[in-house]
């Protein structure tokens, strides 16, 4: 039998991603300080931004600030929108060969390049701190430590800050993107959950039933209010990855927050939930890549 979640209180407790991310960053700064005190190189992160998309610029600025906070040296590559795939490939080759660079971040989406997979696969897997390279996703599928996709790994960290067990729970993931939904399923399988994944071909009645059965609900689609809060199981943990700007300027998630907060035990706010954890986890991956640099077979181990 699968353990059921406890009954909800009158309102959910917020999983404050900003606070938890700050705690993680403080610990990472201590790790960088210890590296430097031991005479090791400062971790280096190459941040590549193509074009001037406002949302991408905000994300990159947040990542650069986090790098500065923990003592990672950020190498900025702000490129014009007309940058070609061939030019990006040449830059990636250069960064792969640079010993000062331990992590490479290519901010997505890339204007004029509808399929970035070729470029992602060109990154040295040992420097793929986003965790998107097929080799790193493969390590995760084999239950091995490695550079894991940042958002799912950050969500696992969030779950560890609740008073609820993860093992033995029913988990439903809505959304099956390569960067969030699919690796999230792998993370929760490794954690001992029974995992259901829902997507655009899932019939509406099956989607509703899967959400109502979820002790842990992760929604990552990018459609405001896709999941009515009334569907949330009493006592569930709700992780809302979606961030959507409404016509009135408000930022909302994919889950109806007000109703969900009256049923869930824990829920992430939007904004301030998953986003800060993604950035902090990117820094975590960068430091781990620096620690593993030059050590054959480092950074991979059975979980």
Swiss-Prot record:
Record GO biological process: L-histidine biosynthetic process; methionine biosynthetic process; purine nucleotide biosynthetic process; tetrahydrofolate interconversion
Leader sequence range is none
Top-level taxon in the UniProt lineage: Bacteria
Amino acids binding NADP(+): 175-177, 243
GO cellular component, as recorded: cytosol
The chemistry this enzyme catalyses reads: (6R)-5,10-methylene-5,6,7,8-tetrahydrofolate + NADP(+) = (6R)-5,10-methenyltetrahydrofolate + NADPH; (6R)-5,10-methenyltetrahydrofolate + H2O = (6R)-10-formyltetrahydrofolate + H(+)
| One Pfam family this sequence matches | THF_DHG_CYH_C
Classification via SUPFAM superfamilies: Aminoacid dehydrogenase-like, N-terminal domain, NAD(P)-binding Rossmann-fold domains
Q: Which UniProt keywords apply?
A: Amino-acid biosynthesis, Histidine biosynthesis, Hydrolase, Methionine biosynthesis, Multifunctional enzyme, NADP, One-carbon metabolism, Oxidoreductase, Purine biosynthesis
Molecular function terms in GO for this entry? methenyltetrahydrofolate cyclohydrolase activity; methylenetetrahydrofolate dehydrogenase (NADP+) activity
State the family named in the UniProt similarity comment for this chain: Belongs to the tetrahydrofolate dehydrogenase/cyclohydrolase family.
* NCBIfam families to which the protein is assigned, alphabetical: PRK10792.1
Q: How does it assemble?
A: Homodimer.
List the HAMAP family: THF_DHG_CYH
Q: What is this protein called?
A: Bifunctional protein FolD
What organism is listed for this UniProt entry?
Xanthomonas oryzae pv. oryzae (strain KACC10331 / KXO85)
What phylogenetic lineage does the species belong to? Bacteria, Pseudomonadati, Pseudomonadota, Gammaproteobacteria, Lysobacterales
User: What gene name is given for the protein in this entry?
Assistant: folD
């Amino acid at each position: 039998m699968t353990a059921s979640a406890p009954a909800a209180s009158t309102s959910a407790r917020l999983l404050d991603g900003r606070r938890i991310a700050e705690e993680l960053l403080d610990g990472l700064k201590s790790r960088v300080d210890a590296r430097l005190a031991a005479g090791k190189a400062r971790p280096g992160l190459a941040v590549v931004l193509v074009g001037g998309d406002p949302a991408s610029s905000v994300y990159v600025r947040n990542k650069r600030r986090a790098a500065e906070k923990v003592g990672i040296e950020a190498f900025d590559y702000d490129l014009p929108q007309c940058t070609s795939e061939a030019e990006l490939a040449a830059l990636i080759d250069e960064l792969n060969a640079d010993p000062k660079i331990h992590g490479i971040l290519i901010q997505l989406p890339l204007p004029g390049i509808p399929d970035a997979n070729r470029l992602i696969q060109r990154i040295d897997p040992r420097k793929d701190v986003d965790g998107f390279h097929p080799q790193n996703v493969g390590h995760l599928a084999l239950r091995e430590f490695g550079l894991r996709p940042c958002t799912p790994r950050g969500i696992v960290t969030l779950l560890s800050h609740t008073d609820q067990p993860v093992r033995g729970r029913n988990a439903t993931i809505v959304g099956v993107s390569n960067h969030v939904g699919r690796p999230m399923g792998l993370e929760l399988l490794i954690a001992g959950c029974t995992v259901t994944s829902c997507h655009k071909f899932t019939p509406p009645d099956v989607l509703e039933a899967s959400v109502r059965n979820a002790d842990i609900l992760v929604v990552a689609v990018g459609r405001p209010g896709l999941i009515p809060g009334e569907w949330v199981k009493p006592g569930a943990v709700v992780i809302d990855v979606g961030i959507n700007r409404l016509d009135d300027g408000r930022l909302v998630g994919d889950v109806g927050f007000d109703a969900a907060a009256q049923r869930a035990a824990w829920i992430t706010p939007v904004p301030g939930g998953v986003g800060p954890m993604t950035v902090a986890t990117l820094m975590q991956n960068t430091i781990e890549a620096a620690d593993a640099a030059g050590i054959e077979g480092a950074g991979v181990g059975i979980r």
